[in-house]
Amino acid sequence: PDGPPHRKQSQILVPIDTPGVEILGPMYVFGNDDAPHGHMHIRFTDVRVPASNMLLGEGRGFEISQLRLGPGRIHHCMRSIGSAEKAIEMMVDRGLTREGFNKKLINLGKNMEVVSRARIEVEAMRLMVLRAAKAMDTLGNAEARIWVSAVKAMVPEKCCDIINEAIQFHGAAGISQWF
């Protein structure tokens, strides 16, 4: 379509049983397999659909994408927090079952503090994501962008920090295939 760059894309619905649509398999996002409802690798070969399958109208594809962007970012953050939660669970389990110097690993050095700080960070991330989601619900996506940007910046960084601590907590087992 003619017009400014943000009005040159359209989105269409393609039924999965349309001739030429081939599902190649599920895709993993952050190590998570969301099949059969998640992301799929799909091949389109000479697929044809009626113009009535266009969403909102010609040139409004970017608008649709923008509407999904904030919620999508929130969703990715929530999944990342789940990964951080799993890392904490693994640290606690390792700390309570592994011994060194005749003490549980959790009681050595600053290990209890590491786990406690990780818990604090997960709770803070959850509250920030909740705040961003509430802003989207009450203010709309455009006005909530500062909150969405904040969680998009904060959550991945903090989750990586927590996961790194879990790797360190496990020593060599944190990077080997034998654990």
Question: Which residue ranges define each predicted feature?
Answer:
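Short beta-alpha connecting loops at secondary-structure transitions
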Residues: 69-72, 110-114, 143-151
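Hydrophobic alpha-helical segments of membrane proteins
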Residues: 158-166
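C-terminal helix-coil-helix/basic helical segment that borders enzyme active sites and/or dimer interfaces
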Residues: 92-106, 119-154, 167-175
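Amphipathic alpha-helix face/heptad-repeat signature
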Residues: 77-84, 111-114, 118-121, 151-158
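Glycine-rich phosphate/cofactor-binding loops in nucleotide/flavin-utilizing enzymes
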Residues: 66-67, 162, 170-179
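FAD-binding core of flavoproteins
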Residues: 1-89, 93, 103
